[in-house]
């Protein structure tokens, strides 16, 4: 007996309900928490890393499509945002969502061990089924900010997560 299956490879998923407490959960959490607390976000490496962010609602839409479309049977699909950007540009977008004018990202002199320099997913195969991402980076950050504003007890999260990454030797000085 054969079982129908589909494999989905997700790029960097963003949106509300992304953990505040996961020290390694990414740029949206790090930058939003920093701006929310009136601090400068940490920009690792030189900020020119490329990332392919995708909104959680677009991921849900992609999953529903492959569940319902027989052309997806036994196939593998990349699920990405379709518009890769640099970490610096992402930080500028977060600053814009938070109403911060003239923000210029400054690298902090550290890097996260194990981070990939550039991440970009080829979504053309999924697009051939009629799917395309419809939410922008701005949409994802705005949604996360709204969820962040409804949270409580997050005052020391940035320090906690940075310390945790240093303890695990994940956060290191650039040499």
Question: For the regions a protein language model found, what residue spans apply to each?
Answer:
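Conserved beta-loop-beta element that borders a ligand/cofactor-binding pocket
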Residues: 1-17, 42
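Short, surface-exposed helix-loop/turn micro-motifs enriched in polar/charged residues
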Residues: 2, 20, 133-136
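C-terminal substrate-binding subdomain of Rossmann-fold SDR/epimerase-dehydratase oxidoreductases
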Residues: 7, 33-175
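Short beta-loop-alpha junction of Rossmann-like oxidoreductase domains
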Residues: 16-19, 125
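Active-site "substrate specificity/gating" loop of NAD(P)-dependent dehydrogenases
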Residues: 19, 23, 46
């Amino acid at each position: 007996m054969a079982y129908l299956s589909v494999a989905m490879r997700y790029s960097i998923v963003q949106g509300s309900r992304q953990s505040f407490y996961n020290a390694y959960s990414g740029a949206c959490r790090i930058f939003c928490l920093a701006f929310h607390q009136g601090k400068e976000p940490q920009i690792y490496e030189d900020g020119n890393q490329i990332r392919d962010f995708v909104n959680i609602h677009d991921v849900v839409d992609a999953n529903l499509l492959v569940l319902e479309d027989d052309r997806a049977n036994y196939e593998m699909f990349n699920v990405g945002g379709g518009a890769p950007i640099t970490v610096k540009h992402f930080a500028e977008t977060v600053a814009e969502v938070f109403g911060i004018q003239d923000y210029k990202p400054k690298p902090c002199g550290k890097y996260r061990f194990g981070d990939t320099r550039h991440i970009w997913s080829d979504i053309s195969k999924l697009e051939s089924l009629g799917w395309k991402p419809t939410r922008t980076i701005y949409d994802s950050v705005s949604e996360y900010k709204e969820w962040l504003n409804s949270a409580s007890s997050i005052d020391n999260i940035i320090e906690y997560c940075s310390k945790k990454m240093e303890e695990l030797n994940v956060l290191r000085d650039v040499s």
